[in-house]
Regions:
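Positively charged n-region of N-terminal signal peptides that target proteins for export
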Residues: 2-10
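Electrostatic cytochrome c docking/interface patches
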Residues: 16-29, 45, 59, 130-131
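Ligand/cofactor pocket segment of small-molecule handling proteins
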Residues: 24-50
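The canonical Cys-X-X-Cys-His
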Residues: 30-40, 71, 82, 96-99
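Gly/Gly-Pro-rich "capping" loops immediately C-terminal to redox-active cysteine motifs
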Residues: 43-75, 79-87
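Flexible coil segments in periplasmic/lumen-exposed cytochrome c-class electron-transfer proteins
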Residues: 83-86, 90-132
């Protein structure tokens, strides 16, 4: 079965949304890795920030790279240290970013596992990750 046209671009995104992560879906992965600090809807849980200000980052190449680096290597912020999640699979990290993209109703293309893979192996420290 070959897909052409718009369906060819939409299919990877749809597959990521339905991707079983640890057998329970991306919502379970979000709850386990992100929601404890950033909230179920990315609204923030004191003292940790909401993620609404990240929405514009999804629309630029520099912003998208920054989001991937934060998930892989962590980030040092005013509220403390966010851990990196490099132990997760590329598909899982892409699914988390796509979940955030949907939560924020941000503009931008869905992330693919390849977007994560190309940033692995840099061994960056959290304080080296700078917002563009």
């Amino acid at each position: 079965l070959a897909y052409t046209g718009p369906m060819r671009r939409l299919l990877p995104f749809l597959l990521l949304l339905g991707l079983p992560v640890w057998g329970q879906g991306v919502e379970a992965l979000w709850a386990k890795t992100c929601a404890q600090c950033h909230g179920e809807k990315a609204q923030g849980v004191r003292p940790y920030p909401g993620l609404g200000e990240a929405a514009p980052l999804f629309a630029t190449p520099e912003g998208r790279r920054y989001l991937v680096l934060v998930l892989l290597y962590g980030k040092k912020g005013a509220s403390g240290l966010m851990p990196g999640f490099a132990q997760l699979k590329d598909e899982e990290l892409a699914a988390l970013l796509n979940h955030l993209l949907a939560l924020l109703k941000a503009k931008g293309e869905p992330f693919k596992p390849e977007d994560i893979k190309k940033e692995r192996g840099q061994n960056l420290a959290p304080d080296q990750i700078k917002r563009p």
